UniProtKB/Swiss-Prot annotation:
This is Putative ribosomal protein S6 kinase alpha-2. The modification Phosphoserine is found at S180, S342, S347, S712. InterPro entries: AGC-kinase_C, Kinase-like_dom_sf, Pkinase_C, Prot_kinase_dom, Protein_kinase_ATP_BS, Ribosomal_S6_kinase_II, Ser/Thr_kinase_AS. The active site is at D145 (proton acceptor), D500 (proton acceptor).
Length: 772
C-alpha cells in the first residue's frame, strides 16, 4: 500500500479512515461515509469515493477521466458551490478521493419526495447552479455531467456540485474545446452527441441546465417518452430532432427560459454569449446575483438533518448495506499509471496533535524537546530509512541509545492517544519474557508524545518472508505455527486477547533462516475479566468505549460511542490462527473473492457457511492432519471451534517434523495477500458482530435503485410513509402539449428514470473516444 507523504509532512492511508456507511455504488467502486482517525481533523466526517484500479484501466479514456477528476478537484478547491477535496491517495488495488460530506443528499431525492418544485424553489436552485457552473467555466473547466444525482444540498439548503469524473480541465495554452462523447444521455446537448469537427465548448453545460430546469418544474424528463422506446439511441434522436413538449400550464417566462437553454442551434442558445445572458433573462429577474454569489440567498428547501451521520437523503438501498472494503486485484504498472494521484488539503495538515507532528522532524528538535526524557536517552533516526512503520495512532522509527549506540524501534504516539499507549505499555509489560512476543525495553513521555521503546526486528513480515523463500515445507509451516500458538496461548493464559492477529503483525527477529518470530502491535489488545459477572459488565463497557482491530477495516459500530460492538474473546484469535495457517499452506486466503465483481458481503456469506475447500494443486501434498486442524479452527460456531487446549494438543503440531515435501506457497502467494487477509478478517468480525445473520444480497440489487428513490418521501419514526399518495415521475407524450395535473399521485407504471443505466450518481461507466 502507498502511504502518501506530502511536502508538509503528512501521510494518509486507509488506516486513517473508518468506514461508516455506503452512500453509493457504481461500475468502478463505491462511495462511503467515513470518519477521520487521528490528526488535526480527527473525528471529522467525510465522503470517500473508492475506485478499483483494474476497472478504471479497462478503457484508456476512463483512466484519463479518473486522473482528471483528481486534478479538477484540486483546481476547484474552496469554490463555494462545489464539493471540496480533502485527500486523495491510493493502495496497490484502489484509488481513494476523500471529500466533504454534504448531508442534505441528492437533489434527486428531494424532487422525488415532492413531485416537482414550485417556481420560487426551482428559481433558487437554478440561480445557485448558474453561479456554480459559471465558477467552473471561469476556472477553465467544462462540467459535462450536470444532472439531478450530481447536485447535492447542504444542511442549509444551498447547492453543491459533486462528481467531476467527466469534467474537462483546460491547461494553459489549450483551446477551450472538447470532443468526448460522455455524460448521461438525457442531459447531453446536441453537439456532444453529434461531436462536430471543431469540438464543443462549455456551452454544453447550459443545455444540461435547461434539462434540469424542466425536470424541477415538471417532475418529468423532456426527452423520454412513456410507452415508447427509451434506449440511448432513441433519446439521442429526440434531443437532435424533437421539440421540447412543454406543459400548457407552465409559467410563460419559465418556458421561454428553458426553451432558450434547450435551443439546438448553438449560436442561439442562452449562455452562448456569456453567463450574463442567463442572469438577465426575465425568469431570473428577481434574483440578487451578488447575494447568490455570496451564498446569502435564503434557501427555499432546508433539509431536516438529525445528526452528523444522518443519511436519510441518500438511497436506502446503499445506506442499508454493510460498509465493507471489498477485495480487489492489483493491476500491472499501477504505481506508474497513477503517479501523482495523491493529495492532502492544506487545511488538514496535522499540527501538534498528530501521531508524530512536524515538530519531531524540525532541525531544532533538541531545543524543542529539551525536557523530554526520551530525547535525553535516545537519538531518533529522522531519515526515510529510519521510518519502520506508520498507523493511524502512531509511527515507528529506528532510534539509537546514546550511551552505547544500541539500536531499538520506538513507537511514538501523540499525547492525544496517551491512554491507548499506556494501556498497550501495561499489556506489553505483562507479557514480557516470552520468546515470540516483542520485547518492551523502555517507556517515556513528554508534553507532546508517548514513547514505547522496543527491540528492533530486522526480519520480514510473515508472508513477505515466505514469498522470498526458494523452498518452504509443511514442517517449516508447523514450526512457525507452533511459535505463534505458543505466543497466543501465553496471552490467553494471562487473560489477554490480541484482537488483531494477521500476517503483518507477525515479524521475524532477523533474516536468518533459523530466526524466531515475534508477535507485535498490541494496540488493540485487551484484558479479559476473570469472572462471568465481570465479563458481562466488561462487555457493556467495551461496547460503549473501545474501538478495536485494524481501523482501516473497522465497522462504524466499533468506533461510535454508544453503539454496539462484537463480543471479543479468545475465539476470535483462534479463528485468525486458522486463516494464517490456511494462507501459509496454500498461498491463498480462505473465503477470498473469486472474481473482481464479487462483493464483501458474499465473502461474509461464505465465512458464515464455512465455505472453503482444499481443492487445487496447492493442497495436493498437504497432510490430512493439517487440513483437519484448519477445519477445526475455521468452524463457524465458536462453541464448536477448537479450544486452545485442543489446538496445542493437536497431532499436526506434535508430529509434523517429518513432513518435508515442498509447498507451492512461495511461488503462488500474491502480493495482495496481506490486504486480502485483512479484508477477510474484517468480514469475519462483521459477521461475528451480527451473530452470523447476513443481509441477503438479493434484497438490495442495484437495478432497484430508481424504483426505491421514486418512492422516497417523508416517513415517521416507524418508517411508514406519512402520505399514502406516493409521488412518482412521469414522462410527457412526444410531439404534443401535455396538461400539468395538480394531483401528486401518478401512475405507478411511469417514471422519468426507468430507462436509465443503473449507475450511481457519483460513479459511472463513461463512453470513451479518441480525444478528450
Amino acid at each position: 500500500m502507498e502511504d502518501i507523504l506530502m511536502p508538509e509532512g503528512e501521510k494518509v492511508s486507509m488506516e486513517n479512515f473508518a468506514l461508516l456507511r455506503v452512500l453509493g455504488k457504481g461500475a468502478y467502486g463505491k462511495v462511503f461515509l467515513v470518519r477521520k482517525v487521528g490528526g488535526k481533523d480527527h473525528n471529522t466526517i467525510y465522503a470517500m469515493k473508492v475506485l478499483r484500479k483494474t476497472r478504471v484501466l479497462t478503457k484508456q479514456k476512463t483512466l484519463e477521466h479518473t486522473m482528471a477528476e483528481r486534478q479538477v478537484l484540486e483546481r476547484l478547491r474552496g469554490t463555494p458551490f462545489l464539493v471540496n477535496l480533502f485527500y486523495a491517495f491510493q493502495t496497490d488495488t484502489k484509488l481513494h478521493i476523500v471529500m466533504e460530506y454534504v448531508r442534505g443528499g441528492e437533489l434527486f431525492t428531494h424532487l422525488c419526495s415532492r413531485g416537482h418544485f414550485d417556481l420560487e424553489a426551482a428559481r433558487f436552485v437554478i440561480a445557485e447552479l448558474v453561479v456554480a457552473i459559471d465558477s467552473l467555466h471561469q476556472r477553465k473547466v467544462i462540467y459535462r455531467d450536470l444532472k439531478l444525482e450530481n447536485i447535492l444540498l447542504d444542511e442549509e439548503g444551498h447547492v453543491k456540485l459533486t462528481d467531476f469524473g467527466l469534467s474537462k480541465l483546460f491547461l494553459p495554452g489549450e483551446l477551450d474545446r472538447a470532443n468526448s462523447y460522455c455524460g448521461t444521455i438525457e442531459y447531453m446537448s446536441p453537439e456532444v452527441i453529434n461531436r462536430p469537427e471543431g469540438g464543443y465548448s462549455d456551452v454544453v453545460d447550459w443545455w444540461s441546465l435547461g434539462v434540469i430546469s424542466f425536470e424541477l418544474l415538471t417532475g418529468c424528463s423532456p426527452f423520454t417518452v412513456d410507452g415508447a422506446q427509451n434506449s440511448s439511441k432513441d433519446i439521442a434522436k429526440r434531443i437532435m430532432t424533437k421539440k421540447v413538449p412543454f406543459p400548457k400550464t407552465m409559467d410563460v417566462d419559465a418556458r421561454d427560459f428553458i426553451g432558450q437553454l434547450l435551443e439546438k442551434k448553438l449560436e442561439k442558445r442562452l449562455g452562448y454569449n456569456g453567463v450574463d445572458e442567463i442572469k438577465n433573462h426575465k425568469f431570473m429577474s428577481s434574483i440578487d446575483w451578488d447575494a447568490a454569489v455570496k451564498r446569502t440567498l435564503k434557501p427555499v428547501i432546508v433539509p431536516r438533518i438529525g445528526h452528523d451521520l444522518d443519511t436519510q437523503f441518500f438511497s436506502a438501498e446503499f445506506t442499508s448495506q454493510p460498509p465493507l472494503y471489498s477485495p480487489a486485484e492489483s493491476p500491472l504498472n499501477a504505481n506508474t499509471l497513477f503517479r501523482g494521484y495523491s493529495y492532502v488539503s492544506p487545511s488538514v495538515i496535522f499540527a501538534n496533535d498528530n501521531v508524530i507532528g512536524e515538530e519531531l522532524m524540525a532541525e531544532d528538535v533538541n531545543a524543542l524537546l529539551a525536557s523530554s526524557s526520551f530525547f535525553a536517552k535516545y537519538k531518533l533516526d529522522k531519515s526515510d530509512a529510519g521510518l519502520l512503520g506508520k498507523g493511524a495512532f502512531s509511527v515507528v522509527r529506528r532510534c539509537e541509545r546514546v550511551v552505547d549506540g544500541a539500536q531499538f524501534a520506538v513507537k511514538i504516539v501523540s499525547q492525544k492517544f496517551a491512554s491507548q499507549a499506556q494501556r498497550e505499555a501495561r499489556i506489553l509489560e505483562m507479557v514480557q519474557g516470552h520468546p515470540n512476543i516483542v520485547q518492551l525495553h523502555d517507556v517515556h513521555s513528554d508534553p507532546l508524545h508517548f514513547y514505547l521503546v522496543m527491540e528492533i526486528l530486522t526480519g520480514n513480515e510473515l508472508l513477505e518472508r515466505i514469498r522470498k523463500l526458494e523452498r518452504f515445507t509443511e514442517s517449516e509451516a508447523a514450526d512457525i505455527m507452533r511459535q505463534l500458538v505458543s505466543a497466543v496461548k501465553y496471552l490467553h493464559d494471562k487473560r489477554i486477547v490480541h484482537r488483531d492477529l494477521k500476517p503483518e503483525n507477525i515479524l521475524f527477529e532477523s533474516i536468518d533462516s533459523s530466526a524466531r518470530l515475534r508477535l507485535v502491535d498490541f494496540g488493540f489488545a485487551r484484558l479479559l475479566p476473570n469472572s462471568m459477572e465481570q465479563q458481562l459488565k466488561s462487555v457493556q463497557v467495551l461496547r460503549k468505549m473501545t474501538p478495536c482491530f485494524t481501523l482501516q477495516y473497522a465497522a462504524p459500530e466499533v468506533l461510535d460511542v454508544g453503539d454496539s460492538q462484537p463480543e471479543y474473546n479468545e475465539q476470535c484469535d483462534l479463528w485468525s490462527l486458522g486463516v494464517v495457517l490456511f494462507t501459509m499452506l496454500s498461498g491463498q486466503v480462505p473465503f477470498h473473492a473469486r472474481s473482481r465483481q464479487e462483493s464483501a458481503t458474499e465473502i461474509m456469506q461464505r465465512i458464515c457457511r464455512a465455505e472453503f475447500s482444499f481443492t487445487g494443486d496447492a493442497w495436493t501434498n498437504v497432510s490430512a492432519d493439517a487440513k483437519n486442524l484448519i477445519t477445526g479452527l475455521l468452524t463457524v460456531d465458536p462453541k464448536k471451534r477448537l479450544s486452545m487446549q485442543e489446538l496445542t494438543a493437536h497431532m499436526w503440531l506434535k508430529s509434523s517434523a517429518s513432513m518435508d515435501t515442498p509447498l507451492q506457497t512461495p511461488s503462488i502467494l500474491p502480493s495482495s495477500a496481506d490486504e486480502t487477509f485483512n479484508e477477510t478478517l474484517r468480514a469475519f468480525l462483521h459477521a461475528n458482530r451480527d451473530g452470523f445473520h447476513l443481509l441477503d444480497v438479493a434484497a438490495a440489487p442495484l437495478m432497484k435503485r430508481r424504483g426505491i428513490k421514486r418512492q422516497s418521501g417523508d416517513k415517521d419514526a416507524s418508517g411508514n410513509s406519512k402520505n399514502s399518495r406516493v409521488t412518482q415521475f412521469e414522462c410527457l407524450p412526444e410531439e404534443q402539449e401535455a396538461e400539468m395535473t395538480s394531483s401528486t399521485s401518478r401512475p405507478s407504471n411511469l417514471g422519468m428514470m426507468n430507462y436509465r443505466e443503473p449507475n450511481s450518481g457519483t460513479i459511472r461507466e463513461t463512453r470513451g473516444s479518441d480525444s478528450s
